Amino acid sequence: MGAVITSGMEISRKSIRIVFFVALAGALSLPFLNAQNAPAAAPPAASNWLSMLSARLGGTNAGAWTPEQLAAMARIRDASMSDPYALNQLRYLTFNIGPRLSGSPQAASAVEYVAAQMRALGADVTLEKAKVPHWVRGVETAQLVEWPNQTPGTTQKVVLTALGGSVATPADGITADVVVVDNFAQLAALPADAVRGKILLFNHKFDKELAAQGEGGQAYGGGVVYRGAGPIVAAQAGAVAVLVRSVGGADYRIPHTGMTAYSDKVTKIPAAAVTAEDADMLKYLAAQGPVKLHLTLTPQSFPDADSYNVIADRKGTEHPEQVVVVSGHLDSWDLGTGAIDDGAGVVVSMQAIELLHQLNIHPKRTVRFIAWMSEEEGSEGAAQYMIDHKGDAANHIGAIESDLGSDHPTGIYYAGKPALGDWLRPVAGVLDGIGAETLEASPETGEDIAGLTEMGVPSFAPVQDSRFYFNYHHTPADTFDKVDPKHLNENAAVMAVLAYALADSGEVAPR
């Protein structure tokens, strides 16, 4: 099938963050506060590539690329499909290094490891310093100690995990009644002081049906506002702690962590995510009568730590000052090992550099690999990059980020001028061979490259199957076994082909 241009429906991480702050602003003015996967076609043989491409494009002029450059893209695509590099790198990151929370020893080890791997490929490596949060999880336990029709002398375990940045409970924990609401509107409708001195649970359900239709980002955006704004809203209502129903589709009593937020204008209260199963239990019991929970969280926040974005340049032959960014974020949450979020994005970006090296392909412009630091806790690495390179936006020809897992890619998101869609058609024709030919316009393509997008740099991301991503996202199940090797190589092919296309085009991408 030829290139198809549609409107992007996924909510990017940048958009999700915007949604969160819009919801937060709305929450602060509430009345009560003022009172499995699609198979990809086999790639065509190199010998008949050019004729097949011409047929796919229906005679459309290839525009920015010569037939030889299009053939080079096909070589990159095909080589990626049999290349074990990304999978081996991901195995090392997740097994040998493990979770990479910003400020942690593992994050520091990952920086050094990735830098060494890029040097081994002949890239010019720079470690650009950024101050990042240093938050450590600690103990996290909860038990129901009183509930309707309780068997005398018993308690019930509640499975939860602290939200990123949460403050601690007192050392001996908090014991308080639980109030359950599904949304901010239900909270606003409660009598005054109904939550004061109690633990508040926001029980907003993740829309699994929407996610199953391929709109995982939309489903995530509907729930993440409670994780983000919940502590502020609950504290202003007088709660002593806040719980949120996990934002994700996991079934096996697995909690989803994620960053939360506080305001200096209200008391900072402990915050945790409970599993969907435990949220259902709490709602059921609370409807029958008083429910009392004992909660212990012992996270610690230390002074910001020094960390680094790993930047590796494969220098261009004609315009080395012009760069094309290919990237993922190196940090991860600490419950799993950060395989799909976002080890996969890092290693497919590494493979883009490795493929150019292996195939001895030298684009006109510099291909810049970036492993961003601290995306999960505030995108401090990306913010620092924008400070360090604020005067160089004109020389950023394009930016690519992969941060939606590693499932089968169906095409490319692009943000920028509408003309980018037609400009990319020949590239989509190359990617048709792996079922990744769709072109989708989107306001944003990634959290870490959002600053470049806002400065007019054309930006891109793989369009990925998101039906299953939020089952594992931010959970203990985000591990190496969730990554399909074939799909990982398909994503690497998209990243590498697109990076080469941007870096070697006869005319730069429209902007």
PLM segments and residue spans:
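Bacterial N-terminal signal peptides
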Residues: 19-31
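Noncatalytic luminal/extracellular "stalk/propeptide" segments of secretory-pathway proteins
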Residues: 45-69, 91, 95-212
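N-terminal capping segment at the start of a domain
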Residues: 63-104, 254-259, 331, 403-407, ...
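Soluble metallo-hydrolase cores and metallopeptidase-like ectodomains found primarily
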Residues: 72, 147, 159-192, 260-339, ...
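Second-shell loop/turn segments in exported
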Residues: 73-80, 95-105, 180, 213-231, ...
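Metal-dependent peptidase/peptidase-like ectodomains
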Residues: 81, 119, 171, 176, ...
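Short helix-loop-beta-strand segments that form the rim/entrance of peptidase-like active sites
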Residues: 88, 354-380
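His/Asp/Glu-rich mid-to-C-terminal helical/loop segments that flank catalytic regions of hydrolases
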Residues: 354, 358, 470-511
